[in-house]
């Protein structure tokens, strides 16, 4: 599957936020190929239902997750992820992202499967030490459209939201993870699944 075979030109819309940057490419993946990649990932990725401990109680994480890459473990929210080897589809997507981000070489990807609008991820920053000082996070959306919210950690009126459609690419960069939180909120009206792939570089 060749992601470069499409007629429409692809370019980023760059949003300079206070203390960070977010770039959005709405047509990163051709619409006629998004369903094929979605189905392949849904069926072949080794999805896990992780558990998280909060306030002394164990709860299921409200989405399924998977961790793939070059061999680096990753820890977030007390969950230790051991990588599965890259699949062809993941490498296809990674290489095209790297084409649009010269100089970036991602060695890992965290995948999230939101089964419907009840699944979510709460406010957080991707600021784990193994990601380095100012990590570049490249996020591809497939499937259902979901809202992506950001808010500044210390300035309440600094907010940003965008509807992420299937085939879109979001890049978070600069000092964004130091100063901003992001989330995928519950949206009860959404009754279809979404897969999110967040490519990142674990520092050796």
Q: Could you describe each region identified by the protein language model?
A:
Residues 1-204:
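Non-heme Fe(II) oxygenase metal-center motifs and adjacent flexible, charged/small-residue loops
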